[in-house]
Amino acid sequence: TAANSSSLNDGAAAVVVMSKEKAEELGVTPKMKIEGYAIAGFDAELMGYSPKFSSEKLANKLGVDLKSIDMFEINEAFASQAYAVSRDLGLDPEKVNIYGGGISIGHPIGATGAMLTVKVMYELMRTDKKDAMISMCIGGGQGISMYFTKCE
């Protein structure tokens, strides 16, 4: 319903991804490092829940304890979906979507990954937080997660 789902909005975000060597060559100061990503699928009938599985898969792949990560941005297509993912991962609510998710700030279709990446980048840059994970639900019962660390 309109009260618990994200609205469709215009919006944009951009990210530039390059190797450390290329950044040095261009004189660009890296802000974050992509440590890894994972994709998982689940029953498409349970829309939006697969980020739980992609986040667990990524944490296992990298040997990272989810509870030790400083912040999370979870795509909030629906309040119940984002809440269920966060709850079932056992995440501290104070670390999840700390400036609001898709319901409060909108959900421009096709910009989710870049927007979540930019949100965590700015939070890592302005605080002493060291790492972040983003995740989103994608079509057909899939989820994708990416883990970043701050470049010092």
What is each of the regions a protein language model found here?
Residues 1-152:
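Claisen-condensing/thiolase-fold acyl-transfer catalytic domains that form or cleave C-C bonds
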